[in-house]
Each structure stands twice: as structure tokens, then as C-alpha cells.
Amino acid sequence: MAEAGARRPFFRRRKTCPFTGPNAPKIDYKDSKLLMRYVSERGKIVPSRITAVSAKKQRELARAIKRARFLGLLPYVIR
């Protein structure tokens, strides 16, 4: 028999990627409003384990953010 105080470990449900699905937004370097949601207060790209973006879409997102920074649409550092 199991111990009286033993509990099952808590498993957090894996979030789904916000860029996959039928009406998901397209990653575009010109869409600075969308890209700002994936940049931290300090201006760093937020990791996929926090945003739940898939690996393929995270690479696309990083490329779009870097492209927007280069063109001056997004800042490199936010003060």
C-alpha cells in the first residue's frame, strides 16, 4: 500500500506554440508589435521555454527580431 502522505508529482501542461494552427499570426520582421511580445524589458529575445514557441518557429522569430533591429524597427537595448 502507498504511504499516507505520498502525492503524485505535479506535471505542468505543455503550452502549445502560438504560431502553429489555422489562424496563427505569420512571423514577419515588419510586424514590430508582434515581435515586441517576444523581447524582454531589457531588449533580449525571450527563450522558447517561457514563450512555448516551437524550435522551428523560435529560429524564425529570432531571425525576424534581428532583421527588425538591423533595419531600425526594433531597439537593440531598451533602457
Swiss-Prot record:
Superkingdom per UniProt: Bacteria
Record GO cellular component, one term: cytosolic small ribosomal subunit
Keywords: Ribonucleoprotein, Ribosomal protein, RNA-binding, rRNA-binding
Keyword RNA-binding: yes
SUPFAM superfamilies in alphabetical order: Ribosomal protein S18
GO molecular function, one term: structural constituent of ribosome
Gene Ontology process terms (BP): translation
The keyword rRNA-binding appears for this protein: yes
Matches recorded under PANTHER family: 30S RIBOSOMAL PROTEIN S18, SMALL RIBOSOMAL SUBUNIT PROTEIN BS18M
Protein function: Binds as a heterodimer with protein bS6 to the central domain of the 16S rRNA, where it helps stabilize the platform of the 30S subunit.
HAMAP family in the cross-refs: Ribosomal_bS18 (MF_00270)
Family, as annotated: Belongs to the bacterial ribosomal protein bS18 family.
Subunit structure: Part of the 30S ribosomal subunit. Forms a tight heterodimer with protein bS6.
Annotated protein name in UniProt: Small ribosomal subunit protein bS18
Protein source organism: Rhodopseudomonas palustris (strain HaA2)
